[in-house]
């Protein structure tokens, strides 16, 4: 269904170009499938001298998907998703063990001219979240609001505006209860394999600005290179290659140009799927 999408999709294309797949850790992911179709994914991540592990199992039956994740911190998160309850409607139930206050139920509805999401925490005094986007794929406006029913206070209220055409997506977001304004831009250069993007954020309370800009180029259908730079002087680069179907390795590096004598950070990620 073609429409404006849900609220988190405002500015997502620029965020993906600037931040997605960049990392300074070492990460290995292996996915296997059992004979009855259950997908099992094991992930190991090394951060400094610490190693974190996670194992995920996913079961799909028609329009129902069940995800169970367990990590090395002894947390178990279960998510049950039911697609197309009616055309355009999705329901999501999630809860974690041992966190008894983590339960949440969410409904998402996508239409040609609207995208609405409503969620409620499964507690005695839950937090209720409502986000909506109205418009078309070319021009849309949206809002995202959370209410703490225990105090009656709004814990979050954001607003966003998005404009897009065949090769350009621009967005404007008012975040942090109106304290920060973010403008983002994504552009495919001359309908080529190269895209550029930028994100500028202004904080009204501190009167500070942050700017990140970057580019992405598809060398061939299996290889992508990316680079970015921000106003704090940090430069990053990334090379990603799909060396076999669904199996990808990624190498990324970051250097602080204001402290060039310090060692740069290098991250490696390998994801294997049969």
Curated annotation (Swiss-Prot):
Listed GO MF terms: porin activity; voltage-gated monoatomic anion channel activity
PROSITE patterns in alphabetical order: EUKARYOTIC_PORIN (PS00558)
Gene Ontology CC terms, in alphabetical order: mitochondrial outer membrane; pore complex
InterPro entries per UniProt: Porin_dom_sf, Porin_Euk, Porin_Euk/Tom40
Key word Mitochondrion present: yes
Known tissue expression: Expressed in shoots and roots. Also expressed in callus, leaves, panicles, sheaths and stems.
UniProt keyword terms in alphabetical order: Ion transport, Membrane, Mitochondrion, Mitochondrion outer membrane, Porin, Transmembrane, Transmembrane beta strand, Transport
Subcellular locations according to the entry: Mitochondrion outer membrane
Gene3D superfamilies the record matches: Porin (2.40.160.10)
Pfam families given in the database record: Porin_3 (PF01459)
Induction line: Not induced by osmotic stress.
Primary location group: mitochondrion
Family: Belongs to the eukaryotic mitochondrial porin (TC 1.B.8.1) family.
Notes on the domains: Consists mainly of membrane-spanning sided beta-sheets.
Job of this protein: Forms a channel through the mitochondrial outer membrane that allows diffusion of small hydrophilic molecules. The channel adopts an open conformation at low or zero membrane potential and a closed conformation at potentials above 30-40 mV. The open state has a weak anion selectivity whereas the closed state is cation-selective.
Protein name as it appears in the record: Mitochondrial outer membrane protein porin 1
Organism: Oryza sativa subsp. japonica (Rice)
Gene it is expressed from: VDAC1
């Amino acid at each position: 269904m073609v429409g404006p999408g849900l609220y988190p999709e405002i500015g997502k294309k620029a965020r993906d170009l600037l931040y997605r797949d960049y990392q300074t850790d070492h990460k290995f992911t292996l996915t296997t499938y059992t004979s009855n179709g259950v997908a099992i994914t094991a992930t190991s991540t090394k951060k400094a001298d610490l190693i974190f592990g996670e194992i995920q199992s996913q079961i799909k039956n028609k329009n129902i998907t069940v995800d169970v994740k367990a990590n090395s911190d002894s947390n178990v998160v279960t998510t049950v998703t039911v697609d197309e309850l009616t055309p355009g409607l999705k329901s999501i139930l999630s809860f974690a063990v041992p966190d008894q206050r983590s339960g949440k139920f969410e409904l998402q509805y996508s239409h040609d001219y609207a995208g609405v999401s409503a969620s409620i925490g499964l507690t005695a005094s839950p937090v209720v979240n409502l986000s909506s986007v109205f418009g078309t794929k070319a021009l849309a406006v949206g809002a995202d609001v959370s209410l703490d029913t225990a105090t009656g206070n709004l814990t979050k209220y954001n607003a966003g505006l998005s404009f897009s055409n065949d090769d350009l997506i621009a967005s404007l977001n008012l975040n942090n209860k109106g304290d920060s304004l973010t403008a983002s831009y994504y552009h495919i250069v001359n309908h080529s394999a190269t895209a550029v993007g930028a994100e500028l954020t202004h904080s009204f309370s501190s009167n500070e600005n942050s700017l990140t800009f970057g580019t992405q180029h598809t060398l061939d259908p299996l290889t992508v290179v990316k680079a970015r730079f921000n106003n704090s002087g940090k430069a990053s680069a990334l090379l990603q290659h799909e060396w076999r179907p669904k199996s990808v390795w990624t190498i990324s590096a970051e250097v602080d140009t204001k402290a060039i004598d310090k060692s740069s950070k290098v991250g490696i990620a390998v994801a294997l799927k049969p």
